Amino acid sequence: MTSRVVAVLLIMLLGSSTAVAPASAQTVDPEQPSPSNTTLYFWGNDDISDCWGNFDAEGSAGSADEGYGDEVDGSDNQRLEVDITCQMKYNFDEDVFLNPTGKISIEFGIRLDHAEAESEEDEDLNITLMKGNVEVASKAFPDLAIDEDIQITWDLDVEENTTRWNLSGDEPRIRFTISKVGWDSSGTPCEGVFQVLKCGGSFRLYYANNQDGMRSQIQFPIVDAPEI
């Protein structure tokens, strides 16, 4: 009787070990996208000369403590001229697949400071989603408020060219461009060769670790790889 009980317990123990082993062996890398890890967060340094994305919500190491970066332009052209691209900090470990009927949700917190005067050289804020070096979609955001925090929200349908993102080449990037007339400390638009005071503008990009309630992230409708 005793030997029979021991045998039953041994079988149960072996069975439970076999069942648990695969689950315990599986590890999830927080820096890699997956169907359960779909949000790409953005961080950067104080002057946005370096900005990057990471799927790890705690991956803010090296980012500005204030939770944002400012590009301040006061150059000879007396304009706010921004052309910034943020890319993923790490390459994909494997190809990423999106739900073909889903949406890519793009959100960024920004703040602009420039003159409200208009010129032929003006360009509204443009945000471009890129797949590696290839432009996927671009959208202009006209008539944005000056010197106020702005939460940009842009939902983008998944298209045929965005259902699959290949590793080591198709990692997502986001690009910001804007060109506007600057102004000086008196609040007067820049006046070219007649300008006396230092003149320019600024562009602020909030990062995922900001304390102002602004969101800077991209959510992808990631699904499991299709069966071959």
Region roles according to the model:
Residues 1-30, 227-228:
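Secretory targeting signatures
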Residues 10, 100-104, 169-171:
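Glycine-centered small-residue hotspots that permit tight backbone geometry or close packing
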Residues 10, 36, 123-125:
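Residues that flank catalytic or metal-binding motifs in active/ligand-binding sites
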Residues 28-52, 60-103, 107-113, 177-228:
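Proprotein-processing/basic-patch segments
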Residues 101, 116-126, 130:
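Short coil-to-beta strand junction motifs in C2/discoidin
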Residues 112-118, 136:
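Long, amphipathic alpha-helical coiled-coil/dimerization segments that form elongated scaffolds
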Residues 124-184:
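Aromatic- and Gly/Pro-enriched, solvent-exposed loop/edge beta-strand patches characteristic
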